[in-house]
Amino acid sequence: MRNATSVKERLKNYAKKNNRIVQDIFTVYVLERTLYRISVSDYRDKFTLKGGILLYVLFAEYFTRSTTDIDLLGAKISNEAENMKAVFEEIFSQECDDPIVFRMDTLKVSNITEFKEYHGLNVSILAFLDRTRIPVSIDIGFGDIVYPDRVEMEYPTLLDDDPAKMYAYSIESTIAEKFEAIVSLGEANGRMKDFYDICSISGKRDMDGALLQAAIIETFHHRNTGFEEIVAFDEGFCEDPLRASRWRGFLKQKNVLAPIDFTDAIETIQKFLNPVIQAIREDNSFSGTWDSAIRAWK
């Protein structure tokens, strides 16, 4: 097993070299090793990686908000809390070469009520890297679809540990789910991360318009969400002082390295997704190609 003190020093050096906060890097390392344990367990095929930690991997140094938890889609596995607790007791009990210690007496599984049709679960546990205490939180959703199919990926490592090999969301489904959340929450939306993530993706990944359109249609239909009204694109939405304050608070909390104005973020998302949504409303196919370098459809 690796020496905990040595690992901490290497992580501190990594943080210094990359101008990152040390505690953030400790958290990323623990989440990375958590995913590794899932990937070598008997439950690897039951989970699909999604959310902020997936974007952190896809865009590496270009994804500039810190991520503090893991988001998974569960399939062909029980969404009952006691059953999931038994699953993660087994996952966290595995012996691995890294120095992370999980305190099994702190393992908790609770219901998440925000999911529409199927209740989700939150798995939480305390991990220790030497004497440094790092909370681990895993949100697991159920019942969603991934279009195109999920992809197999190798999760990059901060040091030279064995990498996690897991299934992950397609980027199209990632955008579709985040946009559906924006639309369905409407005026009550306080999830700033969805706006930030879509805006970030639009500047870093070229997109096939047909695939993106299909993913949005599948996701919205599956969640019974319509395309008629998008409150976030109304003129007054981004000008609301409380919402702008929440946005600034989100950027600060997540240690975003390149902050952008909320109005600019909304305008970018509109430019990115409005043509696709308009085609859906008119029952037309959309076949453009998104050029992330100039943030425009071709």
Predicted segment positions?
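Structured mid-to-C-terminal alpha-helical surface segments
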Residues: M1-F47, Y56-S66, I70, G74-K298
